[in-house]
Amino acid sequence: MQHYGVNGYSLHAMNSLSAMYNLHQQAAQQAQHAPDYRPSVHALTLAERLAGCTFQDIILEARYGSQHRKQRRSRTAFTAQQLEALEKTFQKTHYPDVVMRERLAMCTNLPEARVQVWFKNRRAKFRKKQRSLQKEQLQKQKDVSTDGALAASDKDEAPSTLNLENQPPSSTSSSSSMEAEAAPHALGSELSVELNVTSAEQSGSESATEDNATDKEEEIKQHREDLKVEKEPAPGNLSPLCKRLSPKPDSPLGSPAISSSSSGVTGGISQSHSYSSSPLSLFRLQEQFRQHMAATNNLVHYPSFDMATPSSIPYLGMNVNMPAPLGSLPCQSYYQSLSHHAQQVWNSPLLQASGGLPSHNSKTTSIENLRLRAKQHAASLGLDTLPN
């Protein structure tokens, strides 16, 4: 059992120190026989230390020698050559074995313990650097992912807002286009119904409001006055009526509807195209007009409306006798030729068969007048397109 003395230090150490002191005294006594003997400096200093120093210093001197205080090792300063050799070995392996450490110590003139500690510190430094790099990479990935998500969300929001903004205009534009497409059809259907049902005056006023209200109403009033005046001549003479068939010189040739209510459908549609449509479309309009005339003949059932068949003669005659385009002809000669053809038609024996027809009222004559003028308009359209 170990006994502890003063201040917790073991008695064994104190006994060893006393034994050492006793041995030293014995050696000094044996040396006194020599005449020149003097006590050694070491013995004196040791005696002085034992006498004047503290008990802790005695213990430290017994353990570590006369320099009893533990000296701190100075930091090793590696040269460039030593560091280069150590780094090359570290690139090969992070955990060199004892043999590699001994060889490296011999090459670098360093203790093997220093080489081992250097590798330990170098591995710690390497791990720290790797952790920092991983953190940086993770941060960059997070930033990139967040930026990409924000950009994607912005892109998704932008087209959605654009679509929301564009949807009402597109719907309105589609509805407006549908209305624009439906408008000509509605006008055409209304005009055809009015042509079949209403009188000549009402249909004339409808087409007048469509093109030029004041001019057309004046023409219709003038036609009424002419009809009243020319009821007085003989019933067989219908040449004034043929004169009335020719349009006025001051009316423009390019107008789509020449004061005729029955040509309101074709004139209204072709007016929107300003005669820039193809000849096929004009021919289709003419065919539709002929069908419409046949339908009106079937609906009204007047006994005197057999003249619809010879009324196609001026159209054919103008196509045959006038090959030149309409724009190259003087207006007055064109009107005279129209009146000449109309006189031939009205004086033909086909009309003489129904000679007792001046008993028509003003409505029937105005309808005939408007129908023939519509035929004349269709013929002018045919002349415009045939030379091309």
Swiss-Prot record:
SMART domains: HOX (SM00389). It holds the Pfam family OAR. A motif (OAR) lies at residues 365-378. In embryos, expressed in mesencephalon with strongest expression dorsally, diencephalon, and rhombencephalon. During somitogenesis, anterior expression which partly overlaps the future eye field, gradually decreases while midbrain expression intensifies and becomes restricted to the presumptive tectum. In adult, strong expression in forebrain, midbrain and cerebellum. Keywords: Coiled coil, Developmental protein, DNA-binding, Homeobox, Nucleus, Repressor, Transcription, Transcription regulation. One of its GO terms (biological process) is regulation of neurogenesis. Residues 206-232 form a coiled coil. Residues 71-130 bind DNA. Residues 160-169, 195-211 have a biased composition (Polar residues). Residues 133-145, 213-233 have a biased composition (Basic and acidic residues). Residues 129-272 are annotated as: Disordered. GO terms for molecular function: DNA-binding transcription factor activity, RNA polymerase II-specific; RNA polymerase II transcription regulatory region sequence-specific DNA binding. SUPFAM superfamilies: Homeodomain-like (SSF46689). CDD domains: homeodomain (cd00086). It is found in: Nucleus. Residues 251-272 have a biased composition (Low complexity). GO terms for cellular component: nucleus. Gene3D superfamilies: Homeodomain-like. Required for eye and tectum development. May act as a transcriptional repressor. Belongs to the paired homeobox family. This is Diencephalon/mesencephalon homeobox protein 1-A. It comes from Danio rerio. The lineage of its organism: Eukaryota, Metazoa, Chordata, Craniata, Vertebrata.
